[in-house]
């Protein structure tokens, strides 16, 4: 099967890790060009050593590149504001965009949950690292019972957070909160990110808290386990930290502002799921699971889009 050529915009932590994954793991797509704006960046230097084409003049340089016409899919790993500019510049060329920033121009995509619904979208958004880790769990719970409120806390090593991540904190919380509702299925969602300065750096940890009514604990527990297995198929370091926990709330009134005022009486429970994500250490060390889950999910999306394009063409 012929490979779809792809380009990556952004030569920072995420973009460089994605390039390494594309080179090592991809089966349906082929990395052609890495695009940056700093000629001396480590990412561009590494790409050149790997025999990959590079551009150091941003998206305009990509458009002018000799291989641009052959490129089918473009990953954008810059920042939310930069993606808006890049998307506008690329809009008329008919390229498929996979957005790894919180810009959310296109629909939110979490591969284990809703990728099949958006294989034909011109621009898909990968939400955030915290979203990729936790939204599958919210979706697993909401597939069993109504989730009145879901809150996620993503704790990442400070050393793994580059300038793009740091400049997008507000966008991170807004985009993740919205996707918890739209993709995860929660009635109300909230996201919190913590940059942990601990030394040595700790791997990514994620907590999912959900408020539900009279839960079938066995069904929820099994649904979560099944979802973890689905995610770990493309993010091998993704795992449950401990058993799913259930706590009955004695005073449901205290959470009425979170649940939108529903189910204030007895029967309200808190479901707690604790996760950790260890990176594959393709570019950064294993503690950077937050980068690994984003790039692994994005690679999964590109592989499926490319395969689907071939299937559609042969029908």
Swiss-Prot record:
Would I find Signal among this entry's keywords?
no
Keyword annotations for this protein, in alphabetical order, are: Aromatic hydrocarbons catabolism, NAD, Oxidoreductase, Plasmid
Where does the record place the catalytic residues? 129
Name the InterPro entries for this protein: Acetaldehyde_dehydrogenase, Acetylaldehyde_DH_C, NAD(P)-bd_dom_sf, Semialdehyde_DH_NAD-bd
Instruction: Output the superkingdom of the source species.
Output: Bacteria
Q: Where does NAD(+) bind?
A: 11-14, 160-168, 290
Q: Which reaction does this chain catalyze?
A: acetaldehyde + NAD(+) + CoA = acetyl-CoA + NADH + H(+)
What are the GO BP annotations of this UniProt entry? catabolic process
Q: Name one GO molecular function term.
A: acetaldehyde dehydrogenase (acetylating) activity
Q: What is its EC number?
A: 1.2.1.10
Q: Which family does it belong to?
A: Belongs to the acetaldehyde dehydrogenase family.
The molecule here is called: Acetaldehyde dehydrogenase 2
Source organism of the structure: Mycobacterium sp. (strain KMS)
